[in-house]
Structures are given as structure tokens and as C-alpha cells.
């Protein structure tokens, strides 16, 4: 069992998937092209749901692509070896995904017209989702309790480092025309509105019936049951009994798991780390 991290420039990555050589390539040699579309998230923020929506927008709601090709081939991960190789060989407009923090991302992005969609989720729900995810998969250090994981998370001692630094870094681009910020909570509350917002950002005009197909085939239950999207094809030796890649897909599940003391400790760190953002910036506040 690979239970430790590959550390790269101060950020921990799950050792099974990441070597320093792969990360060197992804962060320093990868060249972003003008017509690229990049989906960026911190882990466990709704990444697969967003990929599914974007794929369906590109096919105007036709589900054939999402039902026939694994999600990691439709939108390869820049920072994995296989994803990096696929992307460097890919012709035409590329769709890609990354969890990389801003300071590690290829500098070629910042002088390009490539479009970026950055999805943010309430970090308390991210934490709970990550706790259940990592406890069932053989890729990372296992916390002995949720309390331990809260401590790790608040210190940034988890895969891809600090949520707070990740968000602060990427949100510095929020005024750029080619950078769209979405919130998981807003997407859950008004999925169709979010689909239309993504269409506008991408310059895609979909008819009402096509928008309805995007909505239908990107629903949590449909994505959870799609073997091309739910990671059921993942190698069995990585998965422990009881694993499900997509667990609940809800908001505010953290309230079912945090103690009062944990909630207070989290709030204190959140206020300190996210000071300076305008009031009402985050929909869960």
C-alpha cells in the first residue's frame, strides 16, 4: 500500500500517482495553448460533475461521448504521467483538468487566452468528503479519525496542500475575462443557471431541449451510475472495501460529522486565512 506522499515544492501529492519527474514536466514544461479549456478545482469539490457538464455542453447534450470514453481520457489530468502524455500528443482544442495550486501551474497559462473554469466548494464539505474518500483508497496516509483529519486539513498537510492557499491563489485571477469562478453550492441550487453561465463563458449557444439533455445526463445519480465517469474502472488494488468515488454530492453534510469544537476551530482558521475577501464572497457564509 502506497501510504505516503511525494513532496514537490512544498506540496504533498499521493505517492502512487505522482513522481517528482512527472510533476516537473507538468508544472514546468507543459505548454498551454490559446484554445485550451482548463477545469481547475481543489480535490473533492465537484470536479467530475463539472467535467461531465462541460463534455455534455460540447456535444449539445448527446451522451454518447460521456458513455463511451473514460472521464480521464475526455479531460486528462495535466499533473499525472498518462494525462500529461495524452495532452502533449493531442491535436486541436483540448479539455483538461487539474488540482494544481496556482504557484505550481505552468507559467504559459498566464500569457495565453486559454479559458479556465475554477470550481469552489465549502471547505468543510470538502474535508468530510476527502476524509471518507481517502480512508477507502490506497493512495494516501490514513487518518485514524475525522478529528485527526480536521487537524491535517487546517495545517494543509493533505493531498495538494492547503485549501486556503489554493483558493487565495486562484481567486487572484477572478477578474480576468478568461477565468470563470463557480461555486458548488450555487450549482446545486440552480444547476440550469450554472449550465447557461458555462455556455455563455464558452460562447456556446444551446437550444432549450439541448440544455435539458445536459441537465438530465449530468445529474448526480446518472453520473454516479455511468461507469465511464464513476471511477469503477479504477484498478482494484487501489480500492478498499466499501469504496464509492461519488458518495453523496450534497451540501452541508459537514454538519452531520463535525463536533461543535471542530466547527469552532475551523471557523477561526477560515476567518484568519480568508481575511480580505469581500463579505458574501462565498455562498455558504
Swiss-Prot record:
Range of residues in the leader sequence: none
GO annotation terms (biological process): steroid metabolic process; sulfation
Record InterPro entries: P-loop_NTPase, Sulfotransferase_dom
EC number: 2.8.2.2
One GO MF term: alcohol sulfotransferase activity
Record's catalysed reaction(s): an alcohol + 3'-phosphoadenylyl sulfate = an alkyl sulfate + adenosine 3',5'-bisphosphate + H(+)
Tissue: Detected in liver.
Role, per record: Sulfotransferase that utilizes 3'-phospho-5'-adenylyl sulfate (PAPS) as sulfonate donor to catalyze the sulfate conjugation of a potential wide variety of acceptor molecules bearing a hydroxyl group. Sulfonation increases the water solubility of most compounds, and therefore their renal excretion, but it can also result in bioactivation to form active metabolites.
Family: Belongs to the sulfotransferase 1 family.
Protein name from the UniProt record: Sulfotransferase 2A2
Amino acid at each position: 500500500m502506497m501510504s505516503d506522499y511525494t513532496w514537490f515544492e512544498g506540496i504533498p501529492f499521493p505517492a502512487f500517482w505522482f513522481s517528482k519527474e512527472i510533476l516537473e514536466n507538468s508544472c514546468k514544461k507543459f505548454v498551454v495553448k490559446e484554445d485550451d479549456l482548463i477545469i481547475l478545482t481543489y480535490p473533492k469539490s465537484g470536479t467530475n460533475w463539472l467535467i461531465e457538464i462541460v463534455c455534455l455542453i460540447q456535444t449539445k447534450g448527446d451522451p454518447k461521448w460521456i458513455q463511451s470514453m473514460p472521464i480521464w481520457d475526455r479531460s486528462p489530468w495535466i499533473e499525472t504521467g498518462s494525462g500529461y502524455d495524452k495532452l502533449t500528443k493531442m491535436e486541436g482544442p483540448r479539455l483538461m483538468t487539474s488540482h494544481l495550486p496556482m504557484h505550481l501551474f505552468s507559467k504559459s497559462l498566464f500569457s495565453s487566452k486559454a479559458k479556465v473554469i475554477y470550481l469552489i466548494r465549502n471547505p468543510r464539505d470538502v474535508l468530510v468528503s476527502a476524509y471518507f474518500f481517502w480512508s477507502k483508497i490506497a493512495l494516501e496516509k490514513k487518518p485514524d479519525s475525522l478529528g485527526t483529519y480536521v487537524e491535517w486539513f487546517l495545517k494543509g498537510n493533505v493531498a495538494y496542500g492547503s485549501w486556503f492557499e489554493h483558493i487565495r491563489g486562484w481567486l487572484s485571477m477572478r477578474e480576468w475575462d478568461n477565468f470563470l469562478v463557480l461555486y458548488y453550492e450555487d450549482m446545486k441550487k440552480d444547476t440550469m443557471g450554472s449550465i447557461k453561465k458555462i455556455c455563455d463563458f464558452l460562447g456556446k449557444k444551446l437550444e432549450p431541449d439541448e440544455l435539458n439533455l445536459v441537465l438530465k445526463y449530468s445529474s448526480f445519480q446518472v453520473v454516479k451510475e455511468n461507469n465511464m465517469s464513476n471511477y469503477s474502472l479504477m484498478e482494484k488494488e487501489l480500492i478498499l472495501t466499501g469504496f464509492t468515488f461519488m458518495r453523496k454530492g450534497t451540501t452541508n453534510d459537514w454538519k452531520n460529522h463535525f463536533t461543535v469544537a471542530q466547527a469552532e476551530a475551523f471557523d477561526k482558521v477560515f476567518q484568519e486565512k480568508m481575511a480580505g475577501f469581500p463579505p458574501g464572497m462565498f455562498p455558504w457564509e
